[in-house]
Design a protein with these regions (language model features):
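C-terminal capping/lid region of NAD(P)-dependent oxidoreductase domains
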Residues: 3, 302-309, 317-343
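N-terminal Rossmann-like NAD(P) cofactor-binding module of classical short-chain dehydrogenase/reductase
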Residues: 92, 152, 199, 221-222
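Short glycine/proline-centered loop/turn elements that form peptide/ligand docking sites
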Residues: 80-84, 178-188, 202, 206, ...
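Short amphipathic alpha-helix with an adjacent loop that forms part of the alpha/beta core around
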Residues: 206-216
Length: 343
């Protein structure tokens, strides 16, 4: 049986395009001792993948030309020599861009079972996967969110941003403002994602909007964008504010010398504030607990996954490109296949 795979064909100078990838067909891998053979159901895409492609990441081995594109997904276990990954189970794991994969419980972070089979499997890449976990970790473990915080979120219509306000509200937050580009995205921030107010950075003056909505300052900023916007937030911090650094998509395409030079970093000291980044995969041992907690919020109607799904493994390059053209809303993923019937 064949196994279609996407390989890295060239390093992009700007955002990923179809010509940077090559679709090949190989053989389905055979089961190996201590591992599980899985069938890919869904694959997710994330902005950080561009850094892998451009050999710019410090926390992951770089991709060489001809390597399998890396990525996380949801899969069904077809055969297993690993008792922790029984046949028929649904797992979320690092699979790569391919239809079948061998996974190992010793991977870091390890695969984990999606025990919430009453919920759609796609949620394993959104609320019950990297996006939801990133939002929860950033808000609670890093940002120490409080009920009276005035919270601002950049990149609010993206995969992580679509979860931040909802999870913040589930944790007790009262006011969350999101920033996105375009009237439709801003409308959806309020109607679908739990935001109280939306700032359209494509319309009007964003600094004026910040001054109006945060006249007393910002307590917690969940940053997915970086750059000049982060600098503006630094100038508007309340005492003991927290800035959670999740991403910097506004600067991923810029050469180092073209990136923003900060003028307001000293305000961290003046306001006894804190700015901290984190790596979601460092919390892998807690994933099952996070998934159980968020699943309860989904069932209670407190969290609603926002997913942007295309069908077919051949659509993966376009799905990744969408993250840089601003055309996606929510967690961008690809439905690769349906699960096999199991006895």
């Amino acid at each position: 049986m064949s196994n279609r795979q996407w390989l890295l064909a060239a390093r992009p100078e700007t955002y990923p395009q179809p010509e940077h990838f090559q679709l090949v067909a190989g053989d389905r891998p055979a089961l190996e001792p201590g591992k599980a053979l899985v069938k890919t159901l869904f694959l997710g895409v994330a902005p950080v993948m561009l850094r892998y492609m451009r050999n710019e990441t410090e926390f992951q081995a770089p991709l060489a030309i001809g390597d399998l594109m890396m990525g996380r997904g949801v899969a069904q276990v077809l055969a297993s020599d690993c008792p922790e990954l029984p046949v028929g189970s649904i797992v979320q794991a690092r699979l790569g861009w391919q239809e079948y994969a061998l996974i190992d419980i010793r991977q870091n972070p390890p695969p984990f079972l999606l025990a919430h089979h009453d919920l759609p499997y796609s949620h394993g890449l959104s609320s019950l996967g990297p996006s939801g976990f990133t939002a929860l970790i950033g808000l609670r473990e890093v940002g120490a969110v409080q009920s009276d915080d005035h919270i601002l979120v950049s990149g609010a219509a993206g995969g992580v941003g679509s979860q931040v306000s909802q999870i913040a509200k589930a944790l007790g937050a009262q006011k969350v403002v999101g920033i996105a580009g375009g009237a439709d995205k801003c409308r959806r921030l309020i109607s679908d994602m739990g935001y109280d107010e939306a700032i359209d950075y494509k319309q009007g003056n964003i600094n004026t909007a910040l001054d109006q909505l945060f006249s007393q300052g910002i307590d917690l900023y969940f940053d997915n964008v970086g750059g000049a916007l982060l600098d503006e937030v630094l100038s508007r911090l309340r005492r003991r504010a927290r800035i959670v650094i999740c991403g910097a998509i506004s600067e991923y395409l810029l050469a180092r010398e073209a990136q923003h030079r900060f003028a307001n970093l000293q305000n961290l000291g003046r306001q006894d504030a804190r700015m901290e980044g984190f790596f979601v995969f460092d919390y892998g041992q807690h994933y099952p607990d996070y998934a159980s907690e968020i699943a309860d919020w989904i069932r209670a109607g407190q969290v609603s996954p926002v997913e942007d799904i295309s069908r077919g493994i051949e659509t993966l390059p376009l799905a990744l490109s969408d993250l840089y053209t601003g055309s996606n809303v929510g967690v961008r993923m690809v439905h690769v296949a349906d699960p096999d019937p199991m006895p």
